[in-house]
Swiss-Prot record:
GO terms for molecular function: ATP binding; pantoate-beta-alanine ligase activity. One of its GO terms (biological process) is pantothenate biosynthetic process. The reaction proceeds by a bi uni uni bi ping pong mechanism. Beta-alanine binds at Q61. The keyword Ribosomal protein does not apply. It is found in: Cytoplasm. Pathway: Cofactor biosynthesis; (R)-pantothenate biosynthesis; (R)-pantothenate from (R)-pantoate and beta-alanine: step 1/1. It comes from Aeromonas hydrophila subsp. hydrophila (strain ATCC 7966 / DSM 30187 / BCRC 13018 / CCUG 14551 / JCM 1027 / KCTC 2358 / NCIMB 9240 / NCTC 8049). This is Pantothenate synthetase. Belongs to the pantothenate synthetase family.
Length: 285
């Protein structure tokens, strides 16, 4: 497995593979890898001859300097896991390589609408940082396919729209959320949980599933469901950040024409901000 940290070396290897007629799948990450990331890598192998990953803690997408400073950096362990998973090349740039003129003067990419909704409203600038770094990584790697987790539902929707709007010749593959046996969605942020908090954490998914069951049973009074779910989480020891039930296609308020809803959950448990989502198909008479 090749590990490179500068764009010239990355492009040289990509160019060689292209000359050999090989296809490339890409999995961008911020490191601190878990089984969910490795599932993305496994999926990537099904779509191309070569698999490239990146490990880059992107300062542009953090709205709090403290979160950026505290984000775990586990490069050595991550590279070992990726090599075992059969990755062909890992790109590990520094912020100075990705943003040589600094963040303030760097050109940015922003997806209108989706960047300011829901999670974007709670974390101003976050999705601008995501779309900018993903665009730059796409330009460097020039993949045929890129794999993203469905756990970050809004991020996946944003990247799909960006790729379509900008006519990027890249197939975006959404990969189902990987869960622990007790239902908790795997996340790098789960590492912030204490033992006691980890035992409570599956309540987020249970509450989400309860909402889904109510909707499937015909309860479409969404504000009431949100209020009950928030109360349930807060009673269990969470601090609810946001629960949104919106049209799964547009991420805007559901209408009579909505065919699917997505339940988007975000809540703090101790220091960790946990997210999850579930899509519900509406029964139409």
């Amino acid at each position: 497995m090749l590990v490179v940290n500068n764009p010239a070396a990355l492009r040289e290897q990509i160019g060689q593979w292209r000359r050999e007629g090989l296809t490339i799948a890409f999995v961008p990450t911020m490191g601190n890898l878990h089984q969910g990331h490795l599932t993305l890598v496994k999926e990537a192998h099904h779509h191309a001859d070569k698999v490239v990953t990146s490990i880059f803690v992107n300062p542009m997408q953090f709205d709090k300097a403290e979160d950026l400073a505290n984000y775990p950096r586990t490069l050595e362990q991550d590279c070992a896991a990726l090599e075992t998973a059969g990755v062909d090349m890992v790109f590990t740039p520094t912020p100075e390589i990705m943003y040589p003129q600094g963040l303030a003067s760097h050109t940015f990419v922003e997806v209108p609408g989706l960047s300011g909704l829901l999670e974007g409203a709670l974390r101003p600038g976050h999705f601008r940082g995501v779309s900018t770094v993903v665009t730059k990584l796409f330009n460097l790697v020039q993949p045929d396919v890129a794999c993203f987790g469905q756990k970050d539902y809004q991020q996946l929707a944003l990247i799909r729209k960006m790729v379509a709007d900008m006519a990027m010749p890249i197939q975006i593959v959404g990969v189902p959320t990987v869960r622990a046996e007790d239902g908790l969605a795997l996340s790098s942020r789960n590492g912030y949980l204490t033992t006691a908090e980890r035992a409570l954490a599956p309540e987020l998914a249970r509450t989400m599933n309860w909402i889904a069951e109510q909707i499937e049973a015909g309860d479409h009074h969404l504000p009431s469901l949100v209020a009950q779910a928030s109360q349930r989480l807060d009673k269990a020891g969470f601090r609810t950040d946001a629960i949104d039930i919106v049209d799964a296609a547009t991420l805007e308020a559901a209408t009579d024409q909505s065919e699917q809803l997505v339940i988007l959950m975000a809540a703090y448990l101790g220091k960790a901000r946990l997210i999850d989502n579930r899509v519900v198909t509406l029964a139409r008479s």
